[in-house]
Amino acid sequence: MSSAKDEFYCDILEGLALYTGSALQRDVLTTLSRHDEPRLGAALNKNQMASKMWLADSLLASAGSDFSSILILGGWMGVLGAVLLHDPRFTIAHVLSIDVDPRCAALARSLNATHAQAGRFEAQTADMRDIDYRQRLAGNPEVDRKNLVINTSCEHLSDFGRWYEQIPAGQLLALQSNDYYACPEHVNCVPDLATFALMTPMQEVLYSGERPMRRYTRFMRIGRK
């Protein structure tokens, strides 16, 4: 940040961080100061934050608070990982945020600096369609029940069906999509929740709902495939 306006907002964020003692606000401030990345504004806007808080609240109510590991696909700037790890209602051992964009990993680590330093957060560059989920998610069956895979970018996957087939049966999932067809990057939007449910069959549905936003409606499903 370099302009007087930028410094003005930086001072506000720093003051709020000192007042609230919020490690998340401190991490956000540090990231804004060190990285000249306009997309941070989009990642932290009210619609994005509202969708992430909706996921956190619904996840807590439907699947509980204790997770051994969370794999976030299409994790972008790492905001969802930060929201979950800073939420005192949850006990989460580790979060891995993956995005295909190589510019995202450093930003995600910075936004999650508090937990990255503690070994509880990691960011990697990878294409979610190329991951061997059976190998990555294999382990102790007891622990596996507490593993969660999150994909809030379903609208970005043109070959969504192929990706979904790769997820092992019984895996706990939290999925989001939307009907925002106006965005060129959204190649797999759905018109309604019923269509999203047909795309994401689950043996156990823990939550299925929708949230109207200003320009679109976001859909979410939580359950075991």
Report each predicted region and the residues it spans.
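S-adenosyl-L-methionine
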Residues: 1-68, 100-148
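Conserved class I S-adenosyl-L-methionine
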Residues: 65-78
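A short acidic, amphipathic alpha-helical/loop segment
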Residues: 83-84, 135-138, 160-166
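Conserved SAM-binding motif I beta-strand of class I
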Residues: 92-99
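A short SAM/SAH-binding and catalytic strip from SAM-dependent methyltransferases
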Residues: 141-161, 179
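C-terminal substrate-binding/active-site "lid" region of AdoMet-derived donor-dependent transferases
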Residues: 158-225
